Structure formats: structure tokens, C-alpha cells
Amino acid sequence: MSVLGNYIIQDLIQNVSKGVTETFKFVLERYNSNEVFAYTLYIDDYCSYLGWAANTISHYEIEKVNYPKEDQPFIKWYYPQFAIGLGEVPEKIDSIFNNEIQNILNDANTLISEDNFEQYQAEVYDSIIEGFKKAIENIDKKKTKNVIFFVSIVDSDNTEIMENYSAEQLNSYDKFLTFKNRFQSKP
């Protein structure tokens, strides 16, 4: 039996899809699609908030000079180091994350108990990935050909597992392999 219930799951999927669509469109209005290489959604372990961020080649090139060579592959994919994201754009753009999605997560959090937390967490994560996937399917493939999509978990021991799992669900196999090997590759 579902912890969240079908209504909350569908509402979360629809709003995540809408949020990704609107924010990615905004990113593409500011940056050339060939310049954008990463777009991520990030959430905390307790599923209490969801944010977004996108990175560009030129931003990474500027950022990486501030780090030793061995750290550069990590900052390339670390969303706080990304070019643009939640809180850095007009409120109208972030509104779906700050209002609609936040309200859904607030309501969903009232359903958590000690006995159902892992199932609750899995349902939230799966719904986010499903909404993300719906959005990507509706974006012009020419504009996403260089972009790797993934979900990250903030300050969690499971971050890399979620990032790899979501990248596999959201990208072509080639893009997934590139992402999976991101820390072994040259910056």
C-alpha cells in the first residue's frame, strides 16, 4: 500500500514536470543549449524541499581554476557550484518549487511515521524522477543533446547512488556512462 496515496503522487509528478519544464526553458533563454551540460533536481533525505540547478561549460571553466586539479571533477557535478539555480532567478520562475511543490512536500511530510519512512522516501524519489522524465520527454531533443539530467540528495551517504540511479533513468545510455564515470574522467 502506498504511503503518499495516488493523488499526492500524481500532483507531485505533474508539478515536478511543470517546474523542470519552466526552469529549463528559462535556462535556455539565458544560455545557448550547447553551453548547458548539467541540470539537476536536489532534495534532502527527509524529502522536505526540492530545488533545481543547471551548469554551463563557461561557468565551470571559471570555477575550476579555484580548485586543485584533483577536486575539479567533483565541483563540475556539485550543484552548489552550478551557474544558476533556485533562488538565483526571478521569483516567478522559482514559484512552482517554492510554492506548489513545497506545499505538496509539506502535506506529504505529515504522513511520515517511523514504520513507513523508507517507503515514503522511495515514493517521493520515484515521483520526482517520473515528473523529471515527463518534462525531458517534452523538451526539444536538439536542446538536450548535451545535457545530463540527474537527481541529487543533499548531505546524504546515498547521494552518489541516487545520482547514478536517476541519471540512468533520465538519460541515454551513453550519457549515463559519461555521468557514472564522472569522477574518473579528466575535468
Regions found by a protein language model. Give the residues of each.
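Generic preference for hydrophobic/aromatic residues in regular secondary structure cores
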Residues: 41, 46-57, 77-84, 145-161
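Short secondary-structure junctions and interdomain/linker hinges
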Residues: 23-34, 108-111, 135, 139-142
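Polybasic, proline/glycine-rich intrinsically disordered low-complexity segments
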Residues: 60-121, 125
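Intrinsically disordered, low-complexity regions enriched in Ser/Pro/Gly/Gln/His and often acidic
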Residues: 45, 67-71, 169, 176
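Short N-terminal edge-element motif at the start of the domain
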Residues: 2-36
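Extended, Lys/Arg-enriched charged tracts that mediate electrostatic binding to polyanionic substrates
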Residues: 125-133
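N-terminal interaction modules that seed assembly of large macromolecular complexes
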Residues: 26, 30-68
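Glycine-rich, aromatic-bearing surface loops/beta-hairpins
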Residues: 134-187
